[in-house]
Amino acid sequence: MAGPTLLKESGPREVFCGLTSIVWLHRRMPDAFFLVVGSRTCAHLIQSAAGVMIFAEPRFGTAILSERDLAGLADAHDELDRVCKELLQRRPEIRTLFLVGSCPSEVIKLDLARAAERLNEELSGQVRVVNYSGSGIETTFTQGEDGALAALVPLLPASDERQLLLVGTLADAVEDRQMHLFQRMGIETIRSLPPRQSTDLPAVGAGTTVLLTQPFLTETARLLGDRGARVLTAPFPLGAEGSRRWMEAAADAFHLPDERVAAVLDPLVERAQSALARHRAVLEGKRIFLLPESQLELPLARFLHRECGMQLVEVGTPYLNREQMAAELDLLPDDVPVMEGQHVEQQLDRVRASQPDLVVCGMGLANPLEAEGIATKWSIELVFSPIHGIDQAGDLAELFSRPLRRRQLIRPGLHPSSLDPTVHA
């Protein structure tokens, strides 16, 4: 059977760690606090990524492991208990405290699960304490959200009520829009995970139909399935086509009339196609290489190829769950290479050999590639931007047309001359 060519490689990687997901999770749940147990490097990463002033009162922080902790000369558990209690006394509005593991805390085998259990016993339900790992050891940065949501699944109340559960963080306005559309189609009860208040957890059970909004929530989906929920497999809501198929998957699960679904979605798709037209004029025929970082790469590749007319040189992804991504793989062109994992030097060699018009990559690779004359798009920008849904299809396409327009304005042509020196990442 024809389809994309699935490949795999391993080696040195270039990705952020899962702590980065705290940046959007702490905004999603304003009554929660994320306490990273890690090093000063962890603290600097989150502070820089979130862009919060040092004198502000953010809803995240770092319990910094000292040299004495790392050397085993101090009881890190006692110190962690003290820090948590001081934090909760100072910030009484906190309803849920996430203890977030890091590379350093995992290296010294600090048992945050036991710490959370101990604190829950002492706090007697006043504050819920949960833990998950944001370590970058063998993970990529979006998996931090998967870890956080997976930690909440055992806490969800049980209910067999018929409902649609949207799983994965969306911008509030985008989520409101999707819920409104589902209600117009005929689905009455719609909940979301993560909730907008950490204490307002949705129920789950045999009547729950789960629709993932993000492709990196593998563990969360598995645990929800274990709780009796039905997890749908569908393309993800990026672009007009993917978003429509995503919504139609829910409509089919709830046995909604095709005519009613079409009446809601047809006008939206028509407007989206009109918004896409001016960006397709820039993108059509251009060659794009997607390096692995966010796990959004397959849905993005499908959108860019089918709706924007781009040619896929290679589609990289940090991890590939073939069952969860089956609908996306079915929509990719035959024989396009899909590379799971990363050997960053080998991938950069393939980028240089293929000379694509645009490369989607991490921030650390963007400047070296730009210096070699190759236009780039930061993959992390796609995670922080409101790009989901039919209404956002034009905005999503603009994120890719903009760097090509910029390069045309800076200097003619997208490729360096043969005299340009190679800059190694």
Swiss-Prot record:
Q: What note does UniProt attach to the cofactor annotation?
A: Binds 1 [4Fe-4S] cluster per heterodimer. The cluster is bound at the heterodimer interface by residues from both subunits.
What sections of the protein cross the membrane? Answer: none
Which Pfam families does this entry report, sorted A to Z?
Answer: Oxidored_nitro
EC category name = oxidoreductase
Q: Which GO terms describe its biological process?
A: light-independent chlorophyll biosynthetic process; photosynthesis, dark reaction
Q: Which SUPFAM superfamilies match?
A: Helical backbone' metal receptor (SSF53807)
Cofactor(s) for this protein? [4Fe-4S] cluster
This protein's pathway: Porphyrin-containing compound metabolism; chlorophyll biosynthesis (light-independent)
Residues that coordinate or bind [4Fe-4S] cluster: 17, 42, 103
Catalytic reactions on record: chlorophyllide a + oxidized 2[4Fe-4S]-[ferredoxin] + 2 ADP + 2 phosphate = protochlorophyllide a + reduced 2[4Fe-4S]-[ferredoxin] + 2 ATP + 2 H2O
Q: Does the keyword Membrane apply?
A: no
Q: Does the keyword Iron-sulfur apply?
A: yes
Q: Which UniProt keywords apply?
A: 4Fe-4S, ATP-binding, Chlorophyll biosynthesis, Iron, Iron-sulfur, Metal-binding, Nucleotide-binding, Oxidoreductase, Photosynthesis
GO molecular function (one): 4 iron, 4 sulfur cluster binding
Which residues are the signal sequence here?
none
- Tell me the subunit arrangement: Protochlorophyllide reductase is composed of three subunits; ChlL, ChlN and ChlB. Forms a heterotetramer of two ChlB and two ChlN subunits.
Q: What protein does this entry describe?
A: Light-independent protochlorophyllide reductase subunit N
Give the source species.
Answer: Synechococcus sp. (strain CC9605)
Q: What is the lineage of its organism?
A: Bacteria, Bacillati, Cyanobacteriota, Cyanophyceae, Synechococcales
Gene encoding the protein: chlN
